[in-house]
Amino acid sequence: MATVTATTKVPEIRDVTRIERIGAHSHIRGLGLDDALEPRQASQGMVGQLAARRAAGVVLEMIREGKIAGRAVLIAGQPGTGKTAIAMGMAQALGPDTPFTAIAGSEIFSLEMSKTEALTQAFRRSIGVRIKEETEIIEGEVVEIQIDRPATGTGSKVGKLTLKTTEMETIYDLGTKMIESLTKDKVQAGDVITIDKATGKISKLGRSFTRARDYDAMGSQTKFVQCPDGELQKRKEVVHTVSLHEIDVINSRTQGFLALFSGDTGEIKSEVREQINAKVAEWREEGKAEIIPGVLFIDEVHMLDIESFSFLNRALESDMAPVLIMATNRGITRIRGTSYQSPHGIPIDLLDRLLIVSTSPYSEKDKKQILRIRCEEEDVEMSEDAYTVLTRIGLETSLRYAIQLITAASLVCRKRKGTEVQVDDIKRVYSLFLDESRSTQYMKEYQDAFLFNELKGETMDTS
């Protein structure tokens, strides 16, 4: 009789590393200012634009103090002068506690909701509410867990949990749900845990130092903590930070919290918002909550129409308004939705309410420094001559085009088994990928070969 041997496959364990995507502004860590709000020439990923960065630093201090609401700042300048970079630097400098919402001007035009609703939601997303609440917790080291399972296999489990601190020891009776939570979290004797009395949530803090010498197989991530002292039951203040929009969505309908994850918020009634405002004001009076005025950044603000600008005028006067930062690269142009022209495509009455910060074109030295920072961010090694050629391309075309050539040149370099990007790699990708001016030149030369051409009869000097 043949014997069959069963082979068990051992699953292969792979290290899952988190991939950080490199974006256009991922190299920016802050505004690069010192304690006196003086900008450094190159710091935290920011280069040049000293006056604009100093102005942004002053606005940043006003936001941090939280004393102002409804102030609006316009960052105006030519394309490629770092307007969005300054706004991203402000977001990084503010940190995760201050709400920062970034939208583009064209995002508010949707078939699902009105323009004013989209703007209102963006405003409410930018205002945080820090809610303080006191909860009772049980904190101690697990001495023993006894679980009595019914002999039949069916029925509810019961058990006892022994917890201790340096001063006392207590036995707690356990129900079925608590036993399931302890089993799920793999809690065992020697673990230091906290139990929230209101919700029954169990949090594992680590292993007790008294068990450090026990013979046990444990991973490098095992954390050892002191055995808690004092009483087992303690009162702890927990701080939650949520945005007004999140409170709106949760209260707008039954199971509204699910809409936070799906994104299908829809239009929210003004009555709901008024009730929430009244409740938040009440919490504020009682000292339970505080308002954190955040930042709403609207890029390409000239894309808004006259109705949206009219709404912004009114919204900025509200006491629940965040600091509004807008960016535009337009000069004197037509206001969308009208036949009138205005500076930056923004009505005069709104311009009167704005603090305007202007950005100037980067110098050759600044562009070279920015390209160096981008090469470091993208892990690309480049020779000094290649930097000079790339800077020259950036001056003649645009900084964005030069930055986009970095990755392409790096790929060409790797294909020829090189380690450092040389001038030939830059020249090759420059010949492969056209910039805006060379593309326009090509179209004008071969305009008759294209299917549609609106420059009929126009001649161009291509010399």
Swiss-Prot record:
Chief location category: nucleus
Keyword Ubl conjugation: yes
Subcellular location as annotated: Nucleus matrix; Nucleus, Nucleoplasm; Cytoplasm; Membrane
Substrates-to-products reaction catalysed: ATP + H2O = ADP + phosphate + H(+)
BP GO annotations: box C/D snoRNP assembly; chromatin remodeling; DNA recombination; DNA repair; regulation of transcription by RNA polymerase II
Keywords on record: Acetylation, Activator, ATP-binding, Chromatin regulator, Cytoplasm, DNA damage, DNA recombination, DNA repair, Helicase, Hydrolase, Isopeptide bond, Membrane, Nucleotide-binding, Nucleus, Phosphoprotein, Transcription, Transcription regulation, Ubl conjugation
Gene Ontology CC entries for this record: cytoplasm; dynein axonemal particle; Ino80 complex; membrane; MLL1 complex; NuA4 histone acetyltransferase complex; nuclear matrix; nucleus
A Pfam family assignment: TIP49_C
InterPro entries the record matches: AAA+_ATPase (IPR003593), P-loop_NTPase (IPR027417), RuvB-like (IPR027238), RuvB-like_C (IPR041048), RuvBL1/2_DNA/RNA_bd_dom (IPR042487), TIP49_P-loop (IPR010339)
GO molecular-function term, one example from the UniProt record: ATP binding
Modified residues (Phosphoserine): S437
Source taxon at top rank: Eukaryota
Signal peptide: none
Residues involved in ATP binding: G77, Q78, P79, G80, T81, G82, K83, T84
Enzyme Commission code: 3.6.4.12
Positions where N-acetylalanine occurs in the chain: A2
Record-stated family: Belongs to the RuvB family.
Function: Possesses single-stranded DNA-stimulated ATPase and ATP-dependent DNA helicase (5' to 3') activity; hexamerization is thought to be critical for ATP hydrolysis and adjacent subunits in the ring-like structure contribute to the ATPase activity. Component of the NuA4 histone acetyltransferase complex which is involved in transcriptional activation of select genes principally by acetylation of nucleosomal histones H4 and H2A. This modification may both alter nucleosome-DNA interactions and promote interaction of the modified histones with other proteins which positively regulate transcription.
Subunit structure: Forms homohexameric rings. Can form a dodecamer with RUVBL1 made of two stacked hexameric rings; however, even though RUVBL1 and RUVBL2 are present in equimolar ratio, the oligomeric status of each hexamer is not known. Oligomerization may regulate binding to nucleic acids and conversely, binding to nucleic acids may affect the dodecameric assembly. Interaction of the complex with DHX34 results in conformational changes of the N-terminus of the RUVBL2 subunits, resulting in loss of nucleotide binding ability and ATP hydrolysis of the complex.
Name of the protein in question: RuvB-like 2
Species the sequence originates in: Bos taurus (Bovine)
